[in-house]
């Protein structure tokens, strides 16, 4: 079985079909508190975002913390990248960009912080794709990985309304306990893994849904938001993300 659940053609079509990609990355961007804690505690000077096109987190870390950042992906749409950089008052000189295959690339540079957000769940061998991150990481550096949680309500929404997208994800990778164990087996320290965030659901193909489906999904979203505001718990059923952090 091939390790990758997607290919370059999938991502080319994906990015060319997306609208509104060129926005100003805000200071309160998703996971901003967690990344600020890493910066405050570990004081990284350099970071690489793997599989992160169009580089929102590389941009975030550059803009708000002054890190020397690199974007690595096996597909980079140059027109989209330039538009996103311009929207954030940056140029191609501000963010290093490497277009390459993670499975046959040997990095010439190591980084204090290696992060990926929404990458590892697109591969069948979860431990192997985590190990690929470590080739970029300096000794003592921090690994930060996030992925969506499709094992709860949001996963039901994906299966019901966008099975094609659901099947592009390795659902078995969405297990914090297993992720933590893989990291320990790979020699990482200070490993933490868990569900993250208050309730949310989304659909990549929302614009294609019927009016009834959109209204139903909005109802689910509102009920979940109210419930987690009353009882602000992070759990497998309700949290939209999983976060993994460790040091080498």
Region spans (language model):
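Conserved N-terminal segment of class I S-adenosyl-L-methionine
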Residues: 1-109, 113, 117, 130, ...
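A short His-aromatic
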Residues: 118-122
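S-adenosyl-L-methionine-dependent methyltransferase catalytic module, highlighting the catalytic core
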Residues: 7-29, 74, 79, 88, ...
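Short conserved AdoMet
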Residues: 62, 66, 124, 138
């Amino acid at each position: 079985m091939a390790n990758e659940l997607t290919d370059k053609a999938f991502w080319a079509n994906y990015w060319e079909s997306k609208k509104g990609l060129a926005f100003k990355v805000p200071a309160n961007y998703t996971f901003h508190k967690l990344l600020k804690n890493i910066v405050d505690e570990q004081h990284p000077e350099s970071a690489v975002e793997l599989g992160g096109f169009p580089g929102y987190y590389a941009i975030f870390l550059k803009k708000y913390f002054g890190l020397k950042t690199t974007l690595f992906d096996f597909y980079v749409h140059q027109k989209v990248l330039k538009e996103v950089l311009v929207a954030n008052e940056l140029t191609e000189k501000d963010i290093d960009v490497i277009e390459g295959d993670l499975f046959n690339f040997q990095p010439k540079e190591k980084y204090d912080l290696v992060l990926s957000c929404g990458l590892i769940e697109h591969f069948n061998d979860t431990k192997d794709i985590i190990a690929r991150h470590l080739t970029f990481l300096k000794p003592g550096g921090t690994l930060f990985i996030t992925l969506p949680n499709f094992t709860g309500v949001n996963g039901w929404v994906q299966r019901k309304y966008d099975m094609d997208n659901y099947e592009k994800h390795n659902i078995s990778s969405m297990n914090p306990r297993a992720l933590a164990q893989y990291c320990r087996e790979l020699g990482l320290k200070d490993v933490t893994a868990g569900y993250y965030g208050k309730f949310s659901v989304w659909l990549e193909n929302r614009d294609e849904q019927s009016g009834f489906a959109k209204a139903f999904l909005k109802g689910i979203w509102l009920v979940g938001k109210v419930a987690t505001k009353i009882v602000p718990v992070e759990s497998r059923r309700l949290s939209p993300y999983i976060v993994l952090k460790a040091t080498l």
